[in-house]
């Protein structure tokens, strides 16, 4: 028996290994993915097979990123949050949560979106450090934190 190493596995296999979905659900979602050309995680979410937290866990296991909770998002420093415009944050489901002199910690729903990561680096001139969060947690935090800022 081989050891399971999530960093070498596809998202679907991680979700099966973690008991979040069954093989039949993965097969159904993969068939739909051929038609819709969407990310597997989004299809599984749309079908109600997984939760946002299941997807965040799978991303964190696969990519080695930490998960950040909705409560921790709401404790973000507003000066840091405001480094990214509200429109950009909403459009890309990303929120700045912490910074140092050289880095900016981001919470993202899709940590594989390199275009967003590159854009944040250009906007802030800081090296992004990625954390994963659920879509609803990010949307909620964006709404509350940018309301406080405005």
Task: Name every feature range the model reports, one short phrase each.
Residues 1-3, 27-32:
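Short, recurring structural edge motifs at helix starts
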Residues 2, 17, 42-123:
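Polyanionic, low-complexity intrinsically disordered segments
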Residues 5-14, 36-43:
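Short, solvent-exposed linear patches
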Residues 11, 25, 55, 116-119, ...:
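Hydrophobic side chains in well-ordered alpha-helices
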Residues 69-73, 80, 137-150:
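Charged, low-hydrophobicity low-complexity segments
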Residues 127-134:
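Short hydrophobic alpha-helical runs that function as membrane-insertion/retention elements
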